[in-house]
Amino acid sequence: MTFFDRLVTVRAKVLPAKVVDWFARPSSVWWGFAVVHLYFLGWMASFFLNGDTFSDTEQYRQWATDGYNPADLDGKISPWVYPVLAQIPIFLANIAGPSLYLLVWFLIIAALNAVGLHYLTRGPRKVTGIAPAWWWLFFTAFMGFLSFARVEGITAPVVLIALLYAAERPVVAGILLSVATWIKVWPAAVLVPVMIASRQRVQVFFSGVAVTAVVALGTWLSGGLAHILDFLTNQGERGMQLEATFSTPWVWLSVFRIAGSRMADNTAINSTEVYGPGAGVAAFLMQPLLILAALGAAILLVRALKRGAEREELFLEGSLMMVTAFIVFNKVGSPQFIIWLGPVIIAGLAHDWERWKVPAALLMGIAMTTFVIYPLFYTPLIHAHPVMAAVLTTRNVLLVVLLWWSVKRTAELGRKNTAAVPSNA
């Protein structure tokens, strides 16, 4: 009996049969959705009822009121750190005025989540989508303090819908993922595996080109074309952020105050970074390491496809591998990056619950430790508290384990059918 089988046994003993049956009904998921979202709405009401915002939405509100002309920023953080389509939800949230900015921002994300849940639990997934939907709600309970206050909350449900339909409608998925990439870059880590695994990869590629052309045209017409690629360079000189996986050695050097190592704020980009022997070299190397990791993942995907891997499983596990690599080999490592993994796991669980329950458990552990880090005890962490350093280290180790799992399973997809005739590419 596996660990997960034991959990099911415990659940059956603890919960009455009627309760278990209720959780298996499609309607129960919507009740759960309402409870989770009403909780976060109530919590955020303590801010927006006073005309305040929470976390990054304060920066978004400032951009929405000040505009997007870099010449008018006067040393402030540039809004062009995000791809240009992020401007749409950022400005839309100001439609009811600055005092209700947080409320409108929350409602936008809640609406997108509702659409994502609808697609997850309709048609052929009316039954198989229920358990993944509950997993999503529990994940949101831990990550909601981040997802309802970050652009990631906008992109995550869009990526989920794209993954749910990538097998049967890859071009539609390509369009959705391309749009999401122009809001926040990370969906590109999902678009690449979908393109590799799809029989319609050429059409998927040109759907992305078409979206990019429309975005470029719109940006040119609005007078911002000169800044359309600023998001690729605006943060290029930043150091190793505290939460990044590869920052872990300097976190502990800071805890024990070895060789002048420390954690300090980078006020220019509003982040906390680690400083110490070799930290600058590590920051310089992270970009090429990330590129190499992405190339290695792409090669592994192509290899598996040529050996007859099942396409839907390939782009799902490939997406998990690529997105996790984007996090592990990233010198930023912000807590909200964990949100990126949610849509991939949810789509994977809907495709094959048994195969995906291990990474789902790993990600839930990552979400729990991230919740302890932010919003609960971020201040002790930036003051080098050893207990919080241990929590962060645990989170980072779990991320590495998740990356290892995804690489291993993707490689296995390529080995299972070595005798099969290669698929038409």
Where are these regions (language model features)?
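Alpha-helical transmembrane segments and terminal signal-anchor/GPI-anchor hydrophobic tails
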Residues: 225-259, 281, 332-337
